[in-house]
Structures are given as structure tokens and as C-alpha cells.
Swiss-Prot record:
<comment type="function">
    <text>Required for maturation of 30S ribosomal subunits.</text>
</comment>
<dbReference type="InterPro" id="IPR003728">
    <property type="entry name" value="Ribosome_maturation_RimP"/>
</dbReference>
<dbReference type="InterPro" id="IPR035956">
    <property type="entry name" value="RimP_N_sf"/>
</dbReference>
<keyword id="KW-0690">Ribosome biogenesis</keyword>
<dbReference type="Pfam" id="PF02576">
    <property type="entry name" value="RimP_N"/>
</dbReference>
<comment type="similarity">
    <text>Belongs to the RimP family.</text>
</comment>
<keyword id="KW-0963">Cytoplasm</keyword>
<dbReference type="InterPro" id="IPR028998">
    <property type="entry name" value="RimP_C"/>
</dbReference>
<dbReference type="Pfam" id="PF17384">
    <property type="entry name" value="DUF150_C"/>
</dbReference>
<dbReference type="GO" id="GO:0006412">
    <property type="term" value="P:translation"/>
</dbReference>
<dbReference type="GO" id="GO:0000028">
    <property type="term" value="P:ribosomal small subunit assembly"/>
</dbReference>
<dbReference type="InterPro" id="IPR036847">
    <property type="entry name" value="RimP_C_sf"/>
</dbReference>
<dbReference type="InterPro" id="IPR028989">
    <property type="entry name" value="RimP_N"/>
</dbReference>
<dbReference type="GO" id="GO:0005829">
    <property type="term" value="C:cytosol"/>
</dbReference>
<protein>
    <recommendedName>
        <fullName>Ribosome maturation factor RimP</fullName>
    </recommendedName>
</protein>
């Protein structure tokens, strides 16, 4: 089973049980060295604690063990954690919540010869992201069609 199919299966299985105040942010499945790691990223207002990750792991693990047929080709390690400061913004809802935040947006196709923009997300209407960014010393604004976004995440301003 391809990694994306595994990720989709895990998302479909665990998303109904991750209830407020928690939010399922992302799922990743990858090989690290000789091990497979299934990472489930969960967040809540104010961040999650170690106790939260233990509680969520105890909730999620039996659900994954009950999936039939087993989608995992090998044994894996389950990791439940916070998405961190540079959390991915994978849905329109996540982008809407991120308005006013500093973001990094990678594009499938360049706009004015630029494929990566980093700046303040000032608006998102479901179709277009508006970002204020610094080009050398000049403040600029770019409007990015949502369908051209390859990857978006929160960014840390240094």
C-alpha cells in the first residue's frame, strides 16, 4: 500500500475520535533508517502536553491495531506529538485560522520568478492567499491562487 493510502486510512480512522479541545493537524508515514514511523500530529489551544500525548496515544493505538486489512506493510512506531512552531497548513480551514500569522508558502509554479514566499498572511478567501512580504528592503504584497500552493506552513520570524 502506498504511503498516501496509509496516511488517508489513518486520517479516516483517527479523525472521528480526536475531539475538541484537540485538533488533528497532520499524519506522516515514513521510513527512518530501518524503522517505519507513523507520526500523528495533534494540537490544541495553548499547545499539547506530554500527558496529552500519552492520552492520545492510548486512544489512537488500539484503533490502528483494529484496521482490517492491515494497511501497514511492516511494523511501525507510533509517535503522537505537537506539530511544532512550523506546523503545516494543509487545509483551507488551517489557512483561515493562520490569517495574521507569519507563513512560508511554496508554489507549484513561480509568480514573478518566485516559488517560495515568506511573510504575513493578511487574507485568505478560499481561493486566494494575500501575503505581505519583504523583497530586499521593500514591502510588497502578492496574491497567490490557492490551487498553485504546493505546501504552506507557519514560519518563525527571525
Amino acid at each position: 500500500m502506498a504511503n498516501q493510502t496509509i496516511i488517508d486510512t489513518v486520517m479516516k480512522t483517527v479523525s472521528p475520535v480526536i475531539e475538541p479541545p484537540y485538533e488533528l493537524v497532520d499524519v506522516e508515514y515514513e521510513k527512518m533508517g530501518s524503522d517505519y514511523i507513523l507520526s500523528v500530529f495533534v494540537d490544541k489551544e495553548g499547545g499539547i502536553s506530554v500527558e496529552d500525548t500519552v492520552t492520545l496515544t492510548e486512544l489512537i493505538s488500539p484503533l490502528l491495531d483494529a484496521i482490517h486489512p492491515d494497511p501497514f506493510p511492516e511494523q511501525y512506531m507510533l509517535e503522537v506529538s505537537s506539530p511544532g512552531l512550523e506546523r503545516p497548513l494543509k487545509t483551507p480551514e488551517a489557512l483561515t485560522k493562520a490569517i495574521g500569522s507569519y507563513v512560508n508558502v511554496s508554489l507549484y509554479k513561480a509568480i514573478d520568478k518566485v516559488k517560495v514566499f515568506q511573510g504575513d498572511l493578511v487574507a485568505f478567501d478560499g481561493d486566494t492567499l494575500t501575503i505581505h512580504y519583504l523583497d530586499k528592503t521593500r514591502q510588497k504584497t502578492v496574491e497567490i491562487p490557492y490551487q498553485t500552493v504546493a505546501k504552506a506552513r507557519l514560519a518563525v520570524k527571525l
